[in-house]
Amino acid sequence: MTFSGAEIRDKFISYFRDKRGHLALPSSSLIPDNPTLLLTSAGMVQFVPIFLGQAPAPNPPRAVTVQKCARAGGKDSDIENVGRTARHHTFFEMLGNFSFGDYFKKEIIPWSFELVTKELGLEPEKIYVTIFKGDEQNPADEEAYTIWNKDVGIPAERIFRMSRKDNFWGPPGPTGPCGPCSELYYDRGPDYGCSDDPAKCGIGICECDRYLEIWNLVFMELFKDENGNFSPLAAKNVDTGS
């Protein structure tokens, strides 16, 4: 099953708007209303005031967007990989859905799997996922593991526990909303791998094009202050980017 970029965009929007009751909102400007950012680097940037409780959420409190993004420097920069891989770009459109204190992990995890397998036709057995393994600052995301494993049915050998570098998102600037995340990967097959040895080619091991990250589910529930301390946000939110 093959789709054009426009068809994938339309399917993503229609799934969340028509099937999951989201408000479809336009992309915000590439120039963000945020003094800590040079350019809009993620779909959640326009919603930071809502996540922080400084602005009201839309009605209903869930949204879907296709956000124009640029990454040319800073923490989220992909510029060093542009030209080295087939998947990194400085400018791109990020497909995203957002919950402002509405739904959380037990909803978005099964929805994401349904969208990529039933709506977009990816083979379920080729979907791999990662979760935050925890560290001295924040605990492991056992809730996400249980939902993927028990509710969705992803076997343990296709669920990878990853470090903060890979599976804890944000904030987009030095301070702001953040939280653990769970990423979906698609196995394109051994023809795209860099080695037949699983110890050399795999998620978290190499940067080849076999295992392609297709979606990042961020569980936006914390605020990081200027001293590096974390505190709970007033509501548990969802911020995804594909």
Region spans (language model):
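Alpha-helical segments
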Residues: 1-242
